[in-house]
Amino acid sequence: MTEESNVNESNEASEVQEDHGSLVAARREKKRQIEERGIDPWGSRFDDRILIGDIRSRLDEVKFQKEDGTLIDLPELHEDPEQRINMRQWRSDNGPGTEIGPQVRAAGRIMLQRDKGKLRFIDIQDWSGKIQLFVGQKQVGESDFELAGLFDLGDLIGVDGRLGVTNTGELTIFAEKLHFLTKSIEPPPAKHVGMTDPELRQRRRYVDLAYNDGVLDRFMNRSK
């Protein structure tokens, strides 16, 4: 190995360490702001939640109710975005009406966030599955929407809301109330890198289970 490559690796390691430090500092600042709102950032009870896998199995309870009260089953939904139906067009074709669905309570780890101004889309996951949350400023109120701005990937949150389907055909919980459960100070591994070091994966098994695709499924299958 040349001296130049040694220098390059040293510089890269220094940059990674600096980036990690700034990410941790930002998360600690958000934790402080959460505490200022009177919320315990290290753990809160959240009783009567439903497993995400069980919530997803209740898709058949989501209906389109026409103005005359007639209930129409929704079309088949697909996990593949390329195969999803344009639900906006489907609803328009079926005439004036409203989508109805069961009230659900879920909790999970934040795996993905998308900020759309006065809307946020958040993917949460527990050991049984993953689901999208629709968080609208109008629907959850100013206080909860501001709280959502303090969320980070890896945080544990709870939600109360209505199960439904977005215009793009994705099964979603339309949030009415958010609950902050636990702050994750340590940022997750980069999605394109993950955790590949065997020793590190053993030492930080909780991270391996949470973020590496397929690890939790294999663990659950072996435990049966």
Residue locations for each model-derived region?
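Class II aminoacyl-tRNA synthetase catalytic cores and aaRS-like
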Residues: M1-K224
